[in-house]
Amino acid sequence: MGSQTLQILRQGVWASVTGGWYYDPDQNTFVNALHLYIWLFLLCFPFTLYMALQPSMVIVGIYCGVIAAMFLLLKTVNYRLHHALDEGEVVEHQTRESKGSRGGTGGANDPVTRREDSNGLGDPGGGIEMADFIRQETPPVDCSSRNSYVGMDLNQRMSSTHGRTTVAKAPGSEETVIFRRERSTFRRQAVRRRHNAGSNPTPPTSLIGSPLRYALHEADRPSGVRSWYRTVKSQPSRTPSQVTVLSTSASLLARNGSTHLEGSQDKASTVGTTSLQDEFGTLTPSLYEIRGCHIGLGNFESATRRASNNIWDTDSHLSSSTSVRFYPHDLISLHHIRANRLLTMDPELLEQQDDLSPDLQDAPLGQDNPSAASAAGKTRQYYRLWLLPFLWVGLHFDRLTLLALFDRNREVLENVLAVVLAVLVAFLGSVLLIHGFFADIWVFQFCLVIASCQYSLLKSVQPDSSSPRHGHNRIIAYSRPVYFCLCCGLIWLLHYGSLRTTSSRFTLYGVALTSSLVLASARDLVIVFTLCFPIIFFVGLLPQVNTFVMYLFEQLDIHVFGGNASTSLLSALYSILRSIVTVALLYCFCYGALKENWEPHHIPVLFSVFCGLLVAVSYHLSRQSSDPSVLMYVPLSKVFPQLRSKNPEDPLSEVQDPLPEKLRASVNERLQSDLIVCVVIAVLYFAIHVSTVFIALQPYLSYVLYGLLGAVGLLTHYLLPQLRKQLPWYCFSHPLLKTKEYYQFEVRDAAHVMWFEKFHVWLLFVEKNVLYPLVILNELSGSARELASPKRLDTEVGALMITVAGLKLLRSSYSSPTYQYITILFTVLFFTLDHRHLSETLLLDLFLMSIIFSKMWELFYKLHFVYTYIAPWQITWGSAFHAFAQPFAVPHSAMLFVQAVVSSIFSTPLNPFLGSAIFITSYVRPVKFWERDYNTKRVDHSNTRLASQLDRNPGSDDNNLNSIFYEHLTRSLQHSLCGDLLLGRWGNFSTGDCFILASDYLNALVHLIEIGNGLVTFQLRGLEFRGTYCQQREVEAITEGVEEDEGCCCCEPGHLPHILSFNAAFGQRWLAWEVVVTKYVLEGYSITDNSAASMLQVFELRRILTTYYVKGIIYYVIASPKLEEWLANDTMKEGLRGCSERNYVDLDATFNPNIDEDYDHRLSGISRDSFCGVYLGWIQYCNSRRTKPLDSEKDSALVLLCFGLCVLGRRALGTAAHQMSSNLESFLYGLHALFKGDFRISSVRDEWIFADMELLRKVVVPGIRMSLKLHQDHFTSPDEYDEPAVLFEAISTHQQNLVIAHEGDPAWRSAVLSNAPSLLALRHVLDEGTNEYKIIMLNRRYLSFRVIKVNKECVRGLWAGQQQELVFLRNRNPERGSIQNAKQALRNMINSSCDQPIGYPIYVSPLTTSYCNSHPQLRHILGGPISFGNIRNFVVSTWHRLRKGCGAGCNSGGNIEDSDAGGLSCGTSQSSQSVQSGLVRHSPARASVVSQSSSYRYSSSRHSSLRTSTTGLEPCRRSSTSQLSLRTLPTSLQLRLGSTSDPAGPSSSLSSHSIPPCKRHTLVGLLGNDGLCSTVTDPLSQHHHPHHHPQQHNPTHATVRRDDISYRVQIVDVGQVLENINLSKRKELQWPDDAMRHKAGRTCWRDWSPLEGMEGHVIHRWVPCSRDPGSRSHIDKTILLVQVEDKIVPIIETGVIELGAEV
C-alpha cells in the first residue's frame, strides 16, 4: 500500500504538476538525468531570456528557434532510433574467452550478416520486441565510447538475400560480428490491467518471431542453401535465449494456426527440435527463456491457462467478465509477466503503447541460470543506424530504454504536429511575456506552465488524471499544449477587444457586452486560469482534446441551436455545421424581411415566409439523427447497391440480419414523410402568420396561448405521469391509473393500449405541433421589430438573434417538450408581472431562460444525488476510509454547494472521491459520457479458431453465453422504446436519463443519449445474471414493495387504505431512484435451465436418450432428399459391405447393455438382427411417409445404411466420451462434443462416412440434437412417443418450430435475433473448476419488467468516480469500498455497468436508435408516416370502399346466391360441404382463372379492406346479376359448379344445371366450353389420389368451405384470440390442413399481433357438437379462423362482429 501511494504521488501528482517529469527509481541514471536536464532547460531557458534581455521580439525569435531546433532534433532522433530498431540490422558481437583473458585473432568464428523479414514479434504494445526478452545482452546506455562505433559498410555491393553470407571482420579484432536484419510489424496493442477480462475472439494475425520465421523459410529451401543456416546455427552466437525464443515461437505458431506451419508441420517440428542446440551441443527442449530464466513451455501454458481459459483472453470488447487476468508479483515472476504480455495483446486499444509498469521494466537481472549469464556476457547486440549511404553507427540500445526516454510518435505527421505545437507554445508564451502580462513570481510560474506543456510532448503524464483508459494514451500528450494555445489566443483576443474603442455598444440585461472593463476582466480571468494549469491538470478538470471538442460542439448545438446530443466527434461536428448552415440560410430571409418597412398593423410577407420556413426546418431537424452515417446509408445503398453485398469469406455471410434493412426502411419512410409534412407545415404556418392574426388579436391571443400551453403541459407532463407512477406523489401505494397488466401474475400478450395512453399521445401531439409553434411565432411577431431597432441590437445582429432564438426554441419544443411549459410560464410571469423593466423582448427572454432552466434542473439533480448519498441515517460505509471521510466532509458543505453550482454550469459530473462522502468535480463530458465506442463482441465459432473450439471451448462461461439475451433485449427495445416513451410508459424523460430494467434474471441499465422528435438513441448495459452479493442486495431493494410497510418512526400504527405509511413515504423521498412502473411488457425469452446430470443420472435415462438418438438418425436419413444418391454411392456400398453379412456383429467396447436397447447379450455386441428387432418398425414407418417409398425390408440397402449410420453415431459418442459411457461425467462430455458438432471418426470401419460429409452435418448432428429435445419431452409424457406416428409428428413439428443448436454456433445467435419461437441448447460451463452441463430451453414470450428511473447525475457521478479511481489512482482492489452496495444510490449496479475493464457488464450494446414508426400501437393511434406508398394505399383503399358502398347502394335487394342457388345462404355451416375442393385442385382451366383473378385482386387491393383469403378464392359477394365480371367469377364458380363428396348433405345435388342460361352464356364466353365442362365434370378427381400430396401444405390449395368464406368480420376483443391453440399436442381440433395450423398462432406471427379493429375473412369455423369432425369445436364455443392480411387468427366467435358479405 505504501509503495503504491508513493507511486501515485510520484507518477500522478508530481508528474501532473511538471507535465510529465518525475524521478523514476526503476530507470537507470542516464534516463533520469536526461529527463531532468531537459525539463530544467525548458523551464530555465525562457526565464533566463526574459531576465537577461530587454523585452523585444528578439527573445521571441531566439526562444522559438532554439525550441524548434531542439524538438526537431529530439523527434528526428527518436523516430530514427525506433525505425532502426524496427528495420535496422542487428549486429551481434561474440567475444572469445581464453582462460579469463580476451585475446586472439578469432579466426574460427567468422562474422556473418543475415537479413530476415519478420512480421512477428516486433513491437507488441509499442515497445516490446524480441530483443527485449534477452536484455542481459544490452545493458543500459551511457555516454562512453563502448556503446557506439562508426564503421564503413564493406559489403555494400554484395547481395543481402537469405542464402548469402557476408563477412565483415576487422584485422586483429577480438569480437565476431553478426548482422541480422529484422523488420517487424508493429501493432498498437496493449495489455489491459484489470481484475476481470474476457476472451479474445480475434488473436493477432501474426505473432511469429524473426528466428522462427527465418527457420521456416530455411525449412523450405534446397539442401545446398540449407547448409548455410546449419553453419550459423552451429556457432555459439545463438544463445540459449535465442534458441528458446525460436522454439516457443514455433509453438505459438502452431497454436495460432498460421499458414507457414499448416503447410509444413513436419518441417516446423523439425525446426522446433533439431535446431535447438546450444553451445554445449545438448538438445534444448521447448523452453521460454527470459533473462536467464528457463521456463518449460508446458509449465508456461499451464500457468497462463490457470489465469485464463484462452491465451488471447485480453480483449476488452468481450462479454466474458469473470476470469482474472492479473499477474501479481507473488504468483508469477517478471519473466512470466513479460512472456504473457507478449502473448496477450489487445488490438482494439489503439491509443495505448506500452502498459508495462515502471517497476517491472528494469527489474534486476536474475542469476538463476549461470549458463545464460555467461552466454549474455559473450554476446552483445548493436543496431545499425545509417547516417550516410556508406556510413553507419552501431547503437548499443534497446526498445525499453528508448521508450523510457521519450514517448514514441509512430507517424511522421505526429512528429510534425509535436514540433509545431512546441514552437507555437514557445511563440505565444514568449509574446505574452514580453508584453508584460506577467510580473514578479508569476513570470516563473508562467515559465513553469510553458515547460510542462512542452515537456508533455516529449514524455507525457501516463496515466493522466483525465485519461479515460488504462495504459499509454497518445492523445493526452497533446492536451496541455492545445489548451495553452487556446488560452493564449483567447487572452490576446480579449486584450485586443478591450483596447478597441467603438461607439456601438451592445447591452443585454444591463450588461454592456462590448465594454472594455468586461473584456479586460475576462482576460484577467483567463490569465489566472492559465497560471493554474498545473493544479487544473492534476485535479483533472480538462479532458483530452477530442473529448473537449465533442463536448463544446454538443453544448453549443443543444443550448444555442436547440439540437440533440451527439454520438461521436464526427456527429458533433456534423450537427454544428448543419445548424450553422441552417441559420445562414434562414438569416437571409429574416434580414431581408427586417430591411423592409414595418407598419404597426402589418407584417412583411417575407417575414411570414421566414416564419413558415423556420417551423418546417425546425420540424425536420428535430426528426433527424445526429449521426450522418444513418442519413448517408439510404442514398448510398441506392447508388451503390454492391456496398450491401456480404463478403463471401465472412463466416456469417449466410446469416441474414433483418435489422439493417428495417432501419433503412424506417429512415427512408421518415425522409419521405418529412418531405411532404415540411411542405404542408411551411404553407400552413405561412398562411396563419400572413393573416396578421398575431397582431390583430393581441394581447388576448397571447393570454389564450399561454393558458392553453400551461394547462396542456401541466396535464401531459405532471398530472398524468404522477397518476401513472407506481407511488404517486410518494403518498399512494399503487398507481391511480392502472394498466390492464397491473394485476396479471404473468403477462401473456403485448401491452394493452389504455385510454389515458391514447390521451397522452394526442395531448403530446397537439402540444408539440400546434401550441409551441403558435406561441413561438407569436413571440417572433411581437419581438422582431423591437430587436432589430437601433436601440437594441440593430438589424444585422437582431436578425441573427431572431433566427438563432427561433430555431433553438422550436427545435427544443419538438425534441424534448417535457419541461418547456415550465420555462415559458415562468418567463412570461417573471418578465411581464415581476420585472418588466429587465425584459429584452420575450423572445430573447425565452432563449436565455431555456438555457438557465436546463442548468437549474441539472443543479437540482446534483443536489438531490448529494443529499441522498450522504444522508447520515442511510450512509453505507464501504471501507474504513468512508468512515474517516464522513465527518471531514461536513465542514466543507459550502464548498460542496459551490462545486455543485460550477459543475452544473459546465455540465460536469460531481463524483464521490473513492466512493466516500467527499465530492469533487470531474472533467467535462458529453451526454454520451464514455469516450470509447465500446461494445461487446460475443465469442462464438465465427470468431475463434477451430482448434480452440475443439480443445478449450472458448466463451463457455455463463456471462458470454448469456450476453445474447441482452442483445435480443436491445433489438426488442429498438422496436418499441421510442413508441413506449411517447405513450408515457416510462414516465417523463429527457436527454441523458438513465433507467434500469429489472426482471427475474435480466438487469439492464438503459442510457438515453439522443432524444429527437420521434427517435431515441440509447445504449443498454446488461449486468450479470448471478451478480455479486452487493448486486443482489440492490436488486432486492428495487424489486421489493413498500406497500405493506406499517412503520411510523419507531412504532407500527399502520397506514390508511391505499396510502403509504410514514416511514415508507419518508424513505422513498430519500432515494436517488424511483420505481416508474412495475409491469412494463417487452418481448423477450423466458429461460429454463435444467441440469443435464440429473436428467441423465440413471442408466435408464441414458438408454432412452440413446434410443431417441438412433431414431433421430433414422428419421433424418430417410427424410433427406439425398437418400437415393447415398444408397447408390459405390464408396458407401464398399464401406458397408462388411455390415451386410448375415452373421456380422459389431463388438466395439463402446456399446453398453445398459445404454443400447438393441444390444445382443449373446453376441456381446450389436448385430443387424438385434438392430432390426428394435428399429425396423420405425424405419418402415418413416419410409412410408416418403413421397416415393423405397424398399425397407430387413435385407434392403436402406436398412443397411441406417444400421451403419446408427452404429457410427453411437461409436462417435463413445469416442467423444473416451470409451467411458458408463461414467456420467464422460458421457456428458461426449454428448456435448457431439452436440456442438465435434465428431471424431476413430474407427476404420466408419471411414465410409467421408464419402459425403453431408451425412454428418444433415443426419447425425441433427439426430443427437433432436434426441435431447425428445428426451426432455419424455419427462412430461413418458409413453407418448411409443407410437411411431406421434413420434414422427413430434420430430416434424420440432424441426419446424424449434431451433436446436450449440450456443457457440452463429446460427444460434441468428435464431435468437430473428425471434425464433423456441430454442434448445446444451451448455457446458466450467465454474470454479467444476464442469456443469445444462439444458437451456428458450421460449419467446412477453416478459414483465420493473422500470426504475435513476437520477442521471448519480449515474454520471459514480461512473466518473470509478474511472478516476481505477485509471488514475490505480486502485485494483476487487473489494474496494466504492463498489459496495448502497441501496439509496444503487452504487454497485451503476458501477458494475461501466465500460470494461472499469466495470464488468456482460453486454454493452452499440449506440442504438429507435424510431417511433416501428411501434405498431403508436402507428395505430396516430397513423403511420405520410409517405408516398402510404398515400397511394390510402387512396386505393378509399376507392375500394367507395365502390363497395356504391354497389351496396345500387343493389336491388336481390342476391345472386338466393336467386341462382335455390336460396342457398351464405351463413349455412352445418349443411353445406366443400363444394369446390376438387374444382380447385384438378381443373386446369379453373385453376388458371383462379390464379389470375386472385393474383390480380391481391396486387390491386393488397392494402385495402377487400382482403383476399389464403384459399385464393374471392368471398361471396352480394351484388346484382348485372355486375358479374371476371373479378367475381371465381366465387360464382366455387359456389355453383362444385359437387360435394357427402351425398347426405342438402347441397349434394348442386350442379351446373342450377346456373341460369344467361349466366351460363357469360361463363362460356369467359372460359369456353372446355373450361366450363372440365370445371363442372371433374369434381371427384381428388379421390383418385389417396396418397399424401405435397400441395396440401400450401394454403392456396387447401380445402375450404363455402360458408367459411362467406362473410367478413371485425375483431373487437383481442382477449378472445387463441394464439397457442395450434401448438396443442392432443390434437383437439381437426384442421383443414397442417400448413394452416402452423400459420395460425404466435409461432408464425412473430412480431405481428392482432389488434382491435382489424378486419378479415372467415375461412374456417369449428362449431360445438358438429357431426363433421373437421368442423367440430372441442369447447362449447364456436371458433373462427379469420384471414387478416397474410396472417391467420383463431378467435372465439364472441370476439368478432360480422360485417356481412362483401360487395
UniProtKB/Swiss-Prot annotation:
It comes from the Eukaryota. Keywords: Glycoprotein, Membrane, Transmembrane, Transmembrane helix. Glycans are attached at N256, N564, N988, N1129, N1391, N1622. Residues 1485-1510, 1518-1556 have a biased composition (Low complexity). It holds the Pfam family Pecanex_C. The chain crosses the membrane at residues 31-53, 57-74, 416-438, 477-499, 525-547, 569-591, 603-622, 675-697, 704-721. Residues 91-100 have a biased composition (Basic and acidic residues). It is found in: Membrane. Residues 91-126, 1475-1556, 1577-1598 are annotated as: Disordered. One of its GO terms (cellular component) is membrane. Its main location: membrane. Residues 1582-1591 have a biased composition (Basic residues). InterPro entries: Pecanex, Pecanex_C. It is a multi-pass membrane protein. Belongs to the pecanex family. PANTHER family: PECANEX, PECANEX-LIKE PROTEIN 1. This is Pecanex-like protein 1.
